[in-house]
């Protein structure tokens, strides 16, 4: 049984904003103490999560003893990473005793002669509701509730049968037709809930420089949601931040490439594309492109024929199989096997569409990804790759699976090369809220 109770990094509290103080004391306020739920939604990095989780445990410890409580994230891993690590530091700094039973995903928290138990859950999919069946709880904290299925949240809130129990919701905005927006935020009176809407300026730990940096990172629907904190619909062009004047460049002939990758979107009926990405002075350039559509030409190619074309692509651009790796859609099993049989180094792409679109838009805005006139099919797709309006009307974010082959390959590249590098540079934050 694996347990931990000590952390080496002490949490330093900074002065709270007005909204953070509301979250911290709402359950003691004569105006709100009888409310069943609190909802803290709004922009990213607004100081919602840390104050919500701390207030939740503080409320539980001041009002209950020997009671079970629930805490959930999209996954248990994300909950531990985004909430529990800092929460334990905060609690220990405030003289709570915390024992983390990692094998059972349970925190045992004690102070002033009281002990309560906080069970950790992942609200990943429809089957997740089975995880909370049968347990009686005094409260439930949902981190990023907009990423969870309605069935899980409904089952979890139905377990709150202890007298005085409350639900705590925290999230960034999604579609205005998202189930949580319709069922909770739009029905505060019916749900007997209080809502506190956050913006980044409500986080006192963020400097003006940091605020400006985040403001420049997002575009389109993600800017409306993550910066302005609006429940906005995904419609129109997916990459509406694409600026041809800034993002399509001529590359000097004497440019020396520091590193190169090829990203591949493979299709049998649909198009197959190879995208050459080359690094120079901190920016990646798509300086060559292969595009073939059997549907458009009326003649399909076999895996071996595509690999023949890839060998020609390597020869034409003076590429080495030893140095230039291929990023390929993980679903293209037979094609990947054939590539490896011919001596190519293949790595699986990350095919999370929404995360990939959001991250690639950020890299475009930061000037980390640029294209050339050689990317002719990609440039066409930037003007025709659309959000799915029918899905948006259902409260879902989805793209229309048309005019997306080159941009899918670009997304694979961004998530495999740029995102991994970004994750490696993350350091443990030692500042406060």
Cite the ranges covered by each PLM segment:
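Catalytic acidic motif of RecA-like/P-loop NTPases
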Residues: 77, 146-147
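Inter-Walker segment of RecA-like/P-loop motor cores
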Residues: 80-138
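Pre-P-loop entry segment of helicase/translocase ATPase cores
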Residues: 1-37
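ASCE P-loop NTPase helicase motor core
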Residues: 139, 147-217
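Conserved P-loop
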Residues: 35-105, 181
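Short beta-strand scaffold segments in enzyme catalytic cores
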Residues: 271-277, 411
